[in-house]
Amino acid sequence: MRLVPTSTPAAQPPLILRLSVTDQVLCELRRRILHGVIEGGEPIPESQCAETLGVSRVPVREALLMLEREGLLQRDRRGRTVARTLGGRDYEEILTLRLEVEGMAARLCADARTEQDLEALESNIAAFAAAKSAEELASLDAEFHGILCSASGHRWLLTAWSTIRWPFEALLVKNFRSYIQATSLEESKVSTEDHRRIVEAIRSRKPHESELLVRQHISRWTDWKPA
């Protein structure tokens, strides 16, 4: 497992830090998995991880269990904790699930949304348009769809979304990297206009149009399946 510092610029720390040691370990390991620093199939030894991060094994053990529940880790045949390898089948299954879950979310959101929800979506779109890397784009894209699901007001729908949220972002990082390599950073932001149209339909309280736009948006990614 590679736990050496990476060249990815660190995010600016918030004004008030209240994360527990477990949460800090969770965020750091999740970031490394999402960004591909820890690759699929790579073991994550609890003791080595604790030593490298300068913490005890207890918060590491708790963080690894959380990451396993999030779908980013799994147990291999030898019982080791390894980063989950996400491939074409995972992509297809997550995509088809997103079509149903997020389509429904958009439809419900058009009726249930608040002004705060609209502000959160608009703020996300602005940040997405200003993003400077595949990792930022993936994080903000996943965040946009998470806001939709949360704003739907449907608790079980949000639970369903949470089961795919992090694997979805991990796959998005790969997709945006491929898209940027094939085109450019700016061209990779084609989702910006899709997101704006979705928000306008939701703002206008048009449930069926909102659902249709989300489904069309998700379907655009069909051809960008990872190997």
Write out the residue ranges for each language-model feature.
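C-terminal all-alpha effector/ligand-binding and dimerization domain
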Residues: 2-7, 17, 173-227
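A ubiquitous short alpha-helical element
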Residues: 86-91, 106-111, 129-132, 178-186
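Short helix-adjacent coil turns
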Residues: 36, 116, 128, 132-135, ...
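Hydrophobic, amphipathic alpha-helical faces that serve as interaction scaffolds
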Residues: 97-110, 143-182
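Amphipathic coiled-coil alpha-helices
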Residues: 101, 124, 131, 140-147, ...
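Short linear motifs at protein or domain termini
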Residues: 1-111, 226-227
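Hydrophobic packing residues in well-ordered alpha-helices of helical domains and bundles
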Residues: 94, 118-121, 137, 141, ...
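Amphipathic alpha-helical dimerization/coiled-coil segments
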Residues: 104-127
